[in-house]
């Protein structure tokens, strides 16, 4: 069988564990010519047709492990040239800086910061809101994008996070959510898309987003 | 418009089969965990909790395989509890595809374990399970205590204070079970649910005692729970998840439909 038509998706493994559900969800929607490779090998990432950057754990460890494993050049290269999707802490790692762990400099692909909701977070009417923001919330599309294809506006996705991103360039915001404040949950620029929620835990709409990613040519 | 309250069916799994629950003497078989999980996923469950109640540790391997099987087919969050005592136990379950782990007795005997686990794996995946029983007499101010061993052994720990301490140590969520109510079908203990939900900033899952759909509504509205967990009302087809969500929506609760 020829390898010519084979497509590969690199799921970046930087040693923080639990990429099982991301890989399984991608496999679930992938066709027989698409291989899902969970990898920490820069060469595999460089050779892949598309790249997914998951996020697990706290930001300091995340960024630290990316550097330790020598993955940052490959991540930057992928973001410069092919369809790239970051999820959860992955979106935060693409910002300039995060407030988590006393302040951590991140990859600065999107200018702006990841901020803490705060332990005394409140709703618009002043009532107490729990932090982390955990559960199913509605995602409003702020732009049309191939990754939103066949996903209804305001569909619910599964979130679990205590920090949220605030990009400087509002035109990069692709989706928002409301939790005491309206905040950015999806960012898009060129061939890079990033989401705060977990598509692999978001039932059919989450799987649809992964399917869209596998079909995406990297054009906005 | 905002965050939805969650319905979490719980699978109590003994020797590879879903059973009715620890508190029941006449354990009824409710099927294969993977099939049951798939059914709830299709019905629109917001998460699934898998509680391993197998007595012997030999069967842990079976649990790992089941978690793997569920996680490959069910794309909603999965919490695994029962017998989680070490960071190695947590790592195995997360690698098998669990999103969160429930720590119960081990937290009581070694609270530092919760801190260690939260630092290593992140608070988002650490659920501390609390089994509480009311210990105040009629007419006294309400007081609940933590019990272990299926509600048989008192610990002297105040439930509300313990919940606060666990959150301080890094718990990302509290699964609160009333041992007075578990298995009774008389509804949640709304007093302890509300007391703990108001005392901590992390989400609280109410558990123990659900006998009908109004109990789920009460858990959220009066108990201030962020999520409600039930087992037997769903297992034997008494109610579907959709029916439960519809009842909660009709009561004005925001749900994912």
Curated annotation (Swiss-Prot), chain B:
SUPFAM superfamilies: Ribulose-phoshate binding barrel. HAMAP family: HisF. Its main location: cytoplasm. Gene3D superfamilies: Aldolase class I. The gene is hisF. One of its GO terms (biological process) is L-histidine biosynthetic process. This is Imidazole glycerol phosphate synthase subunit HisF. The keyword Disulfide bond does not apply. Its EC number is 4.3.2.10. IGPS catalyzes the conversion of PRFAR and glutamine to IGP, AICAR and glutamate. The HisF subunit catalyzes the cyclization activity that produces IGP and AICAR from PRFAR using the ammonia provided by the HisH subunit. It catalyses: 5-[(5-phospho-1-deoxy-D-ribulos-1-ylimino)methylamino]-1-(5-phospho-beta-D-ribosyl)imidazole-4-carboxamide + L-glutamine = D-erythro-1-(imidazol-4-yl)glycerol 3-phosphate + 5-amino-1-(5-phospho-beta-D-ribosyl)imidazole-4-carboxamide + L-glutamate + H(+). The active site is at residues 12, 131. Belongs to the HisA/HisF family. GO terms for cellular component: cytoplasm. It comes from the Bacteria. Keywords: Amino-acid biosynthesis, Cytoplasm, Histidine biosynthesis, Lyase. Pathway: Amino-acid biosynthesis; L-histidine biosynthesis; L-histidine from 5-phospho-alpha-D-ribose 1-diphosphate: step 5/9. Heterodimer of HisH and HisF. It holds the Pfam family His_biosynth. Transmembrane segments: none annotated.
